[in-house]
C-alpha cells in the first residue's frame, strides 16, 4: 500500500519543477561533494580537523558527523573507496573515543560521536576490534549510574545512536536502556526539560529556555530561541536510533517516533520559501540566509520519514524537494559547500553565513549535507521504481 500511494503521488507531481531532479543527478552531486572532501579538503583521514585556524582531533564530533554522512552515502553508492577511507581513519585511532590516556573514561558525548561509524563498520566487516574499545568506554560510563550527562541537545546526536547499536552488537540491553534514560532526562528534566512539546522544538540547553534566556540574548538569537542545527541534531538522531530498533512496537521506538512526528510537523512550518531553514528557526529575519547544517539534517529526517512509511509523501516530499534544491545551490563548481555555519551553540555564532563562507571546521557541515542528500537519493529511487 505504501508503494502504491507513493507511486500515485509521484505520477501526480511528475511534471512539477521540484520533481524534475533524478536520483542519478542528486547522487552525482553527492559524489562531487564527497570527492572534494576526500581528495582535496582531507586527503589524509588521520589528520586533525582544520580549516579556519583551529585544529581538533579527527575522531571527535566534527569528523564523526562526516562519517555519518559518508556511510549513508555508501548505502546508495557502495564504493570500496568509502570503506577504505573510513577504515584507515578508524584503525589509526584504534577505534577509540579519544587519543589521550583517558579515552576509556570519557563521558563527553562529543568524543563518542565517532562510535556510530565504528559500529557501522563492524556491521559491515564483523571485526571485533572495531567496537571493543568503545565498549570499554561505554561500560565505564554506564557503571557510574548517572543519567544527566547530556546537558545539551547536540549530545543526543553524538551519543544515542551509538549506544543503541552497541546493544545490537553486544546483545546487551544496558546501553540502550541507559541511553533512553539519558534522553528522557534531557527531554523532561534538564533545565526544566529541553523539549517543548507545545512547539515541537528543542531548546539547545538550559540557557535558552523561555524561562532562563536573558533579555540581551533574546534580541541577538531570537525568542523563542530554537537553533536550527541543534534541532537538526535531535531530528537526525531520532531517525538514526530508530534504524537500530527493528521492533517497531518497542516502547523506546514508540517514544522516539512520537517526538519525531511532533518535530516533523513543527519543522515543516519553519521551512523558508526558498527551501532552506534559517539559523534561528522562529526568528528568520535575524539571520535570513540559507544554513546548510540544519537544512541537511532536516532533509535527512524528512526523507527518512517518507522512506520508512511514517510521514505522508504528499505532504513531505515537496518539502524534501525544495530542501534539496537549496542544498544543491550551495555547492561550488569544485564541490566545496557554502553557507555552512561554523562550530557554535546558537544562531548568532559564526555569522554571517554566506556562499563563500569558510567555516572553522568543514567536516561536520559536509556530513550534514551528505546525510541529507543521500537519504533523498533513496527517496528519489523509490519514487522512480514505483513509476517503472
Residue ranges and their predicted role:
Residues 133, 138-168, 196-243, 288-294, ...:
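The feature captures the catalytic groove of carbohydrate-active enzymes
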Residues 166-174, 241-254, 307-313:
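Inter-helical turn/loop segments and adjacent helix faces that build the functional surface
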Residues 233-282:
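Oxyanion-binding "anion nests"
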Residues 7-10, 21, 25-64, 72-109, ...:
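CBM-like carbohydrate-recognition segments
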Amino acid at each position: 500500500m505504501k508503494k502504491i500511494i507513493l507511486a500515485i503521488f509521484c505520477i501526480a507531481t511528475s511534471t512539477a519543477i521540484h520533481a524534475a531532479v533524478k536520483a542519478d543527478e542528486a547522487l552525482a552531486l553527492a559524489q562531487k561533494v564527497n570527492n572534494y572532501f576526500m581528495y582535496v579538503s582531507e586527503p589524509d583521514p588521520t589528520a586533525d580537523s582544520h580549516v579556519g585556524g583551529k585544529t581538533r582531533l579527527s575522531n571527535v564530533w566534527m569528523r564523526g558527523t562526516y562519517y555519518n554522512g559518508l556511510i549513508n552515502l555508501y548505502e546508495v553508492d557502495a564504493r570500496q573507496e568509502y570503506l577504505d577511507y573510513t577504515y584507515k581513519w578508524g584503525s589509526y585511532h584504534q577505534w577509540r573515543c579519544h587519543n589521550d590516556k583517558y579515552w576509556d573514561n570519557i563521558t563527553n558525548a562529543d568524543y563518542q560521536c565517532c562510535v556510530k561509524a565504528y559500529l557501522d563498520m563492524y556491521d559491515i566487516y564483523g571485526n571485533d576490534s572495531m567496537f571493543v574499545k568503545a565498549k570499554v568506554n561505554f561500560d565505564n560510563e554506564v557503571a557510574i549510574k548517572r543519567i544527566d550527562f547530556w546537558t545539551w541537545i547536540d549530545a543526543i546526536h553524538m551519543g544515542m545512536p551509538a549506544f543503541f547499536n552497541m546493544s545490537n552488537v553486544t546483545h546487551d540491553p544496558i546501553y540502550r536502556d541507559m541511553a533512553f534514560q539519558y534522553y528522557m532526562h534531557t527531554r523532561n528534566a534538564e533545565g526544566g526539560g529541553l523539549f517543548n512539546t507545545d512547539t515541537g522544538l528543542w531548546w539547545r540547553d538550559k540557557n535558552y529556555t523561555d524561562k532562563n534566556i536573558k533579555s540581551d540574548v533574546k534580541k541577538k538569537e531570537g525568542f523563542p530561541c530554537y537553533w536550527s542545527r541543534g534541532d537538526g541534531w535531535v531530528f537526525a538522531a531520532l531517525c538514526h536510533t530508530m534504524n537500530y530498533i527493528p521492533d517497531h512496537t518497542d516502547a523506546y521506538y514508540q517514544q522516539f517516533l512520537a517526538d519525531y512526528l511532533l518535530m516533523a510537523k513543527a519543522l515543516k512550518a519553519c521551512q523558508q520559501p526558498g527551501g532552506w531553514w534559517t539559523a534561528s528557526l522562529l526568528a528568520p529575519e535575524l539571520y535570513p540566509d540559507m544554513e546548510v547544517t540544519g537544512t541537511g539534517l532536516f532533509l535527512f529526517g524528512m526523507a527518512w520519514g517518507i522512506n520508512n512509511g511514517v510521514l505522508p509523501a504528499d505532504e513531505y516530499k515537496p518539502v524534501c524537494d525544495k530542501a534539496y534544491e537549496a542544498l544543491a545551490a550551495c555547492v561550488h563548481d569544485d564541490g566545496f559547500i557554502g553557507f555552512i555555519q561554523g562550530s557554535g551553540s546558537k544562531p548568532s555564532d559564526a555569522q554571517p553565513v554566506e556562499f563563500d563562507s569558510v567555516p572553522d571546521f568543514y567536516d561536520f557541515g559536509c556530513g550534514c549535507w551528505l546525510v541529507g542528500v543521500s537519504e533523498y537519493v533513496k527517496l528519489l529511487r523509490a519514487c522512480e521504481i514505483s513509476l517503472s
